[in-house]
A protein has these predicted regions:
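Charged/polar, solvent-exposed surface patches and flexible loops
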Residues: 4, 19, 23, 57, ...
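Fold-independent oxyanion-binding glycine-rich loops
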Residues: 12-15, 20, 34-35, 42, ...
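N-terminal start-of-chain detector that recognizes signal peptides
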Residues: 29-30, 57-62, 99-105
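Glycine-rich phosphate/pyrophosphate-binding loop at beta-loop-alpha junctions
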Residues: 1-4, 41-91
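Active-site-adjacent helical/loop segments in soluble small-molecule enzymes
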Residues: 1-53
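A conserved regulatory-domain signal marking ACT and ACT-like small-molecule sensing domains
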Residues: 66-163
Length: 163
C-alpha cells in the first residue's frame, strides 16, 4: 500500500534519532518520542532540497518512557562516535590497569564500563571496557595509544550484541 501512496521512504539511523531526542530535552526540557523525532532527524539528509523553503515537522512526545533515557543517551553517544567498547587483554599483574589509565586514555576520556574477571594460572585476562570521549576526533589517538603501548584489544562497536 505504501508504494502507491508515498513518493519515497527514507531511513534514519537509530543513533541519529536518539541524538535528536536528546537535543530538545537538553536545550529546552522538551520530551520528544522516537517517532516524533524522526522528521527532525531526517532534515540534515534533505538540506540541499529544502534550503530556502518552509518546512513543517510534526513533533510528538507522549509515547516516551523516561526510564529509557539512559539507553537513548548510550545509542546517541555510539552514533556520534563518542562512546566505544573494547575487549582489552590485560596482563595479569599488579599495575596493569594503572598503565592502561596512564598511557591509553587521553585527559578527557572516561571509563564508563569495566568488567573484568581475574583468571588464575593465566598470563592475560580479558576485560570489557567502555570509553567515552569528549571529542570524536580523539578516537584515532586512543587506538594509536593501544598500539603504541602494546595493549591487545578488539573493537566492539560494529556489533552491539557484544556489549
Amino acid at each position: 500500500i505504501w508504494k502507491e501512496v508515498l513518493e519515497k521512504m527514507h531511513r534514519v539511523p537509530e543513533g541519529k534519532v536518539c541524538s535528536t531526542i536528546l537535543r530538545p530535552y537538553n536545550e529546552d526540557a522538551i520530551v520528544v518520542e522516537p517517532a516524533g523525532a524522526l522528521s527532525i532527524a531526517a532534515l540534515d539528509d534533505f538540506a540541499g532540497e529544502i534550503k530556502g523553503k518552509k518546512v513543517v515537522c510534526v513533533i510528538s512526545g507522549s509515547n516516551n518512557d523516561i526510564d529509557r533515557m539512559q539507553e537513548i543517551k548510550e545509542r546517541s553517544l555510539l552514533y556520534e562516535g563518542l562512546k566505544h567498547y573494547f575487549i582489552v587483554r590485560f596482563a595479569q599483574r599488579p599495575g596493569a590497569l594503572k598503565e592502561f589509565v596512564n598511557h591509553i586514555l587521553g585527559p578527557d576520556d572516561d571509563i564508563t564500563r569495566f568488567e573484568y574477571i581475574q583468571k588464575h594460572n593465566k598470563e592475560i585476562g580479558p576485560a570489557l571496557v567502555g570509553i567515552e570521549l569528549k571529542y570524536r576526533e580523539d578516537y584515532d589517538k586512543l587506538v594509536a595509544n593501544f598500539k603504541k603501548y602494546n595493549f591487545q584489544f578488539t573493537e566492539l562497536n560494529k556489533d552491539d550484541s557484544l556489549f
